[in-house]
Amino acid sequence: MYTQYGDEVLTSFAELGTSYSGLSGKSAQDFGSGKPFITYLNVYSNNVIKENDFQYVAIKDDEKQNVVKYGDVLFTLSSETPEEVGVGSVYLGKEKVYLNSFCFGIHITNTEVAFPPYLSYYVSLTAFRKFIYPYAQGSTRFNLCKADLEKASIKLPTLADQKRIYSVLGHIDCKIETERQMLNLYNSQKQYLLRQMFI
């Protein structure tokens, strides 16, 4: 199933889980209301999917569409530039959501090898972006060769190390977000004081 090399595990996305496609059979009239789905931009812009940035699509009760689950790794599948193909993100929410048609997902089932929250950082690494770049094929429009990517070998830290790394990076992210909020407050306070000077 996988091979251990010292402090690393050699595996592949095909061994870590099962892949699925995004929405299919939809027209422009189906969008705007209904069930939440993850947009291309949400995947492209965030290493963890933002749950306050869903859009909506009409889906019937008996309609067969793939559902995104907690821990799924999502990738952009198609773009006009190769740099935008294969950009990854991870869904860490619990709401039942769907995925746009220009992305695909991998449902991580082998949680003895991969810690999904850690993968949100892993797929954002510069080294991983360089690794995935050759799988973007095309001329005027580029598509990710999904089958080859799934079979390609990747190296992960041990599960224990993944959890430790995620914990450290998660705390740093929280610190950055706190600092960002404080900066916004200071800027608001500055603007208020400047306005008071000229009343």
Question: What is the meaning of each model-derived region?
Answer:
Residues 1-13, 181-199:
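Short amphipathic coiled-coil heptad-repeat segments
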Residues 1-24, 151, 155-156:
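Non-catalytic DNA-recognition/assembly elements of restriction-modification systems
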Residues 1-3, 165-176, 195-198:
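Hydrophobic structural patches
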Residues 24-27, 96-103, 129, 136-160:
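A short glycine-rich beta-alpha junction/loop motif
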Residues 26, 49-53, 176-188:
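Short, tandemly repeated low-complexity microdomains enriched for cysteine and small residues
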Residues 39-40, 61-124:
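A short beta-sheet element
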